[in-house]
């Protein structure tokens, strides 16, 4: 994790620092470019992002007096901040292709179709995703491995893919924010200056409430899918299983890459070596069990899979881009990080945060502003780390002013910053999840209940005072939670 500390409002030269109205100009420009480019012209996001970078750079250079070197430094710092996510993107795309070719994902799909029904599948997909993400501390790894298999099972059972994807994402992001192994959990507690376990305990009320509501909704939707006739027929399921069994050797040994990857993650190994071990072990399984040649196995990891199972649905589900397919995603991430770096380096984000904080006059208002911060930063910078660090550093004094304990701040950052990542189409998380699960962001968004409910609940808690952690020299944060009004 890269150390990053944003500059405060006072750190910027008043001669260069934009006014509030000026700070909104590049934001309005970027929104306009994205809307026109993607919605009206049907372009990929890379071109509108390029327009936004040029527009913001010209304003900052000739309107506010920043040098080209200062702007480039801002871009460089932002990209360095996002390098961890970029490296993980590279390796997860290799992991997905290798696990498909090794038979790992086909094995899970085959036996999932054997035992699951539409009535129980949707809530079970969310619950299983939550358990795995909590255990390994990674939403991306869970979605890029288990999640793909679950989408395949859901499609075989006749469950709409957006519903399955929404349930998976609810599980993986709730597990990610709650896991003490997650980098975002460590980051939120660190930037808020609170003990890690106080932070984890502080999120329990939100996790339980949002989790129960989400599971109930998924159970209802699963039952509706079954009774509404959208569930797959026995003949369709048998056809899919036949296609899988006829193409792959489905020995239990094909689960070895999964066991190695998750085992290393649970033991505390960083994401890159854990995922790398998963790729190398899957290549070995492809060669030894699926009968691939050495060069063939590694070429598939690079260029992706395109199985011919005789079943179109299975062919589509198991077609992957490999390392080569990650380039499209990473160019979007680079573009979004670049414009986010300019916005941070020129004081745009600090000016907006400073002026917003001046309108606060209550604990509820402080919580609302703090909650909006990560949502806005996630949209503007496309980086989950920045969505936690920038609002955390910016609004820490504001939370202190209203005697809010750091645990309240860290919880708000997680309940909005972590879970909102896959809700934004050009954010690194949104781009990856849409690509990996094969479902556009705007299609799964209505079913991503954790992402919708978590920010709402944390704001309600701020205005009602329920389970808000207040500073008290006589009590610990968890004790003050029991007495807060």
From Swiss-Prot:
GO BP: amino acid transport
Domain of life of the native organism: Archaea
Segments traversing the membrane: 23-43, 48-68, 79-99, 116-136, 148-168, 203-223, 246-266, 269-289, 323-343, 362-382, 441-461
GO MF terms held by the record: antiporter activity
GO cellular component terms given for this protein: plasma membrane
A Pfam family hit: Na_H_antiporter
Membrane topology category: Multi-pass membrane protein
Subcellular location(s) per record: Cell membrane
Alphabetical keyword list: Amino-acid transport, Antiport, Cell membrane, Membrane, Plasmid, Transmembrane, Transmembrane helix, Transport
Catalytic activity: L-ornithine(in) + L-arginine(out) = L-ornithine(out) + L-arginine(in)
Family membership noted in the UniProt record: Belongs to the NhaC Na(+)/H(+) (TC 2.A.35) antiporter family.
Function summary: Uptake of arginine from the medium in exchange for ornithine.
PANTHER family named in the record: MALATE-2H(+)/NA(+)-LACTATE ANTIPORTER, MALATE-2H(+)_NA(+)-LACTATE ANTIPORTER
Protein name: Arginine/ornithine antiporter ArcD
């Amino acid at each position: 994790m890269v150390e990053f500390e944003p500059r405060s409002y006072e750190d910027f030269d008043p001669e260069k620092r934009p006014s509030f109205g000026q700070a909104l100009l590049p934001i309005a420009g970027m929104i306009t470019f994205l809307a026109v480019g993607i919605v009206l012209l049907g372009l990929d996001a890379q071109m509108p992002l390029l327009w936004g970078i040029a527009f913001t750079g010209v304003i900052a250079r000739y309107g506010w007096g920043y040098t080209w070197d200062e702007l480039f430094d801002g871009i460089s710092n932002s990209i360095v901040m996002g390098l961890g996510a970029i490296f993980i993107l590279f390796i997860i795309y290799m992991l997905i292709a290798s696990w498909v070719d090794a038979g790992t994902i086909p094995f899970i799909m085959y036996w999932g179709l054997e035992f699951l029904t539409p009535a129980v599948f949707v809530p079970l997909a969310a619950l299983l995703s939550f358990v795995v993400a909590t255990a390994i501390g990674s939403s991306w790894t869970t979605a890029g491995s288990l999640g793909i298999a679950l989408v395949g099972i859901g499609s075989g059972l006749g469950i709409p893919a957006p519903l399955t994807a929404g349930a998976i994402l609810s599980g993986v992001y709730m597990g990610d924010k709650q896991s003490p192994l997650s980098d975002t959990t460590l980051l939120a507690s660190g930037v808020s200056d609170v003990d890690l376990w106080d932070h984890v305990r502080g999120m329990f009320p939100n996790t339980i409430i949002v989790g129960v509501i989400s599971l109930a909704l998924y159970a209802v939707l699963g039952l509706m899918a079954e009774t509404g006739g959208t569930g797959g027929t026995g003949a369709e399921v048998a056809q899919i299983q036949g296609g899988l069994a006829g193409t792959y050797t489905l020995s239990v040994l094909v689960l070895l890459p999964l066991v190695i990857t998750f085992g290393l993650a649970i033991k505390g190994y960083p994401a890159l070596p854990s995922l790398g071990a998963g790729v190398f072990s899957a290549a070995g399984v492809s060669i030894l069990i699926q009968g691939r040649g050495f060069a063939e196995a590694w070429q598939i990891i690079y260029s992706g899979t395109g199985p011919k199972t005789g079943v179109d649905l299975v062919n589509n589900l198991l077609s992957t881009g490999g390392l080569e397919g990650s380039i499209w995603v990473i160019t979007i991430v680079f573009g979004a990080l670049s414009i986010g770096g300019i916005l941070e380096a020129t004081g745009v984000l600090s000016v907006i945060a400073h002026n917003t904080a001046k309108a606060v006059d209550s604990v509820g208002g402080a919580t609302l502003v703090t909650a909006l911060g990560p949502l806005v930063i996630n949209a503007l910078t496309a980086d989950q780390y920045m969505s936690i660090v920038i609002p955390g550093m910016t609004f820490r004094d504001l939370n202190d002013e209203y005697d809010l304990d750091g645990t309240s701040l860290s919880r708000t950052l997680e309940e909005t910053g972590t879970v909102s990542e896959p809700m934004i189409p050009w954010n690194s998380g949104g781009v990856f999840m849409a690509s990996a699960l094969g479902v556009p962001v705007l299609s799964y968004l209505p079913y991503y209940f954790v992402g919708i409910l978590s920010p709402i609940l944390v704001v309600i808690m701020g205005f009602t005072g329920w389970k808000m952690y207040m500073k008290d020299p006589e009590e610990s944060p968890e004790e003050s939670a029991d007495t807060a009004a």
